[in-house]
Regions:
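Active-site-proximal, substrate-binding regions of enzyme catalytic domains
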Residues: 28, 38, 48-76, 81-83
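Short secondary-structure transition/capping segments
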Residues: 54, 91-92, 109-110, 125-129
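Active-site neighborhoods of divalent-metal-dependent phosphate/nucleic-acid chemistry enzymes
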Residues: 76-119
């Protein structure tokens, strides 16, 4: 599979940075695929503040900045247009508005997949949600 575009959910980034078991190795592989150019990876703009906030209990400010720089070497940042955010507001069938925004950000870059460990939260997603492990299996086919 060539030219695959993915949006990586904040939970995958957090699994990677915090070496959270049992997800760390799968998260590492996703970040590595993005960094090496096997896939083109994106991170939703609003995920950066989520990552920053959660990491405050794991590490000091300087370390968080260093980790964000590393992540941003592997992933491009994307947002959603005004129109896509308005569309998200109207998508009341999404249980979690933040996940709906992830879906809109993925749509904005024509992503084929949202890489997440919370696939169940994306059952209404326009973009296919897949776990890091399942994505790696898919790529190997």
């Amino acid at each position: 599979m060539k030219n695959i575009v993915v949006l990586v959910d904040a939970n995958v980034i957090l699994d990677y940075v915090t070496t959270r078991d049992p997800y760390y190795h799968d998260a590492y592989k996703i970040i590595d695929m993005c960094h090496s150019g096997i896939v083109k990876g994106y991170l939703a703009f609003h995920s950066i503040s989520i990552i920053w906030y959660v990491l405050r209990k794991y590490m000091p400010d300087a370390d968080r900045r260093s980790w964000l720089k590393k992540i941003l070497q592997a992933l491009h940042v994307t947002g959603a247009s005004h129109e896509l955010v308005l569309k998200a507001v109207d998508m009341d069938y999404f249980m979690d508005f933040e996940d709906c925004l992830q879906d809109r950000c993925a749509e904005s870059v024509n992503a084929q997949y949202i890489i997440t460990n919370n696939v169940k939260d994306f059952k209404e997603s326009v973009i296919t949600a897949i776990t890091p492990r399942d994505f790696e299996r898919l790529i190997k086919q």
